[in-house]
Amino acid sequence: FGLQITPMRPLVRNRRLWRPWSAVNLWFPWEKIHNVPDARFAKDNYPAMRKSFSSDGSIPLFHYFAGFSASPENPGYPQHANEWSITPPPAGTEVSPNDREWRYVFMCAGSRSYRDYYLRSMSRCMRELKMQELYFDNCWSWFCGNEAHGCGWTDEHGKKYCTANILGSRELAKNIYREHRRQYPYGLIVRHISQIPEPPLISFCDALVDGECFMLDVGRDESYYNVFRPDFFRASFRGEQFGMPSVFIPQFERAYQLHFPEKLKDSKAGKLPGQEKHMRHFIGYILAHDTHAWPNFGVSVSKYLKIMDNAGITDDSAFYGYWQPDSPVRTAGTLSDRIMASAYAADNGALVILMNDTDQPADVLLSLDSKVFGNSPALSDAESGKTLSGTAVSVPARDFRMIRIIKK
């Protein structure tokens, strides 16, 4: 099942033109230490890094921050550690203690003192460094039992319990959003929350980054065959039901780096068995659901986005998902629900993404609405440019076809 936020706001403009790394940079690690919003901690080469990461200032650049994690080098931490900390674990427990840039302790947004401190620092930092776009990592709610700031409770037998800091996390997210919009009315905020779409938090951002929950599965199987299902993907990774686009981080090479190092060299050389097919299966799901892939860890989508650009697909182009009964492009006959035909309205016709998520090749007959495409539209393979002789299309197992339809 999926959550539905109502009312839904429109998706941000130009989101189909987002090209991570070339038209937008969603991730800019700008600090010497982790998540302390203070210009004094900018890296020594910050001006040069900012120029490079933003293509000389020509594309939006999202400065990296976080939620519940922050460096113990935060100037206010030594004095307020006991009040600000999430407990358990004990206050002062560090993650990655030997890596200065990424070492952190656990901070609780349930602490009003911490929220006020963070917001004051963030307001000043955004203004001083002109941060028009922000990226927040580690920003879902946590359970906390720290009574020093009001979390936790004790039952009649004296047993202590944690409480979820949802309201404090919402308050911090809301106030950051308001202050950011006050300074930069047309700026954007991205939150990276994999598979925890908390409406109280994601209501205060413009896009979601997801996909980090499947590292071991993908590393073991070298594919998303056992992860993706049409209904699961539709409910989890489209973002439309939350009023914001979702960007999926593929885990191929990242999984190999962290858990299966013996596979990394072959992956980078493109020599893993079935590697190209596994990549196309992943990309097919992205395209068939009108969502976004983070082009990293072995995945490139540039070729397919160029095809969409050449077809004239923009933010204003209608999208017809395979699940929508009013789509002008349907599959004829009774087929597996793992065979999907989605369509984007394009110049003088449509671009169809025909996805076959089964283990067998599929011969699919497309049923086209004559009121939209006329009685004898021209069909071609958008990747090869070859003309099709009719509306019957063969799709390899665990693969997709991009079919261009021209109205006649």
PLM region spans:
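The substrate-binding groove and active-site-proximal loops of carbohydrate-active enzymes
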Residues: V24-K43, D99-L119, D155-S169, G270
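C-terminal beta-strand-rich structural cap/linker in extracellular carbohydrate-active enzymes
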Residues: S389-K408
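Active-site groove signature of glycoside hydrolases
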Residues: Y118-G152
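Carbohydrate-recognition beta-sandwich/jelly-roll modules
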Residues: F1-F68, E133, I286, N296-I307, ...
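Conserved beta-strand positions
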Residues: A23-W27, F136, G145, R191, ...
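Active-site-adjacent "subsite" loops/lids of carbohydrate-active enzymes
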Residues: P47-L129
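Short, acidic/polar
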Residues: P7-R16, Y114-R127, M279
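Active-site-proximal substrate-binding groove within the catalytic cores of carbohydrate-active enzymes
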Residues: N165-G374, A378, E383
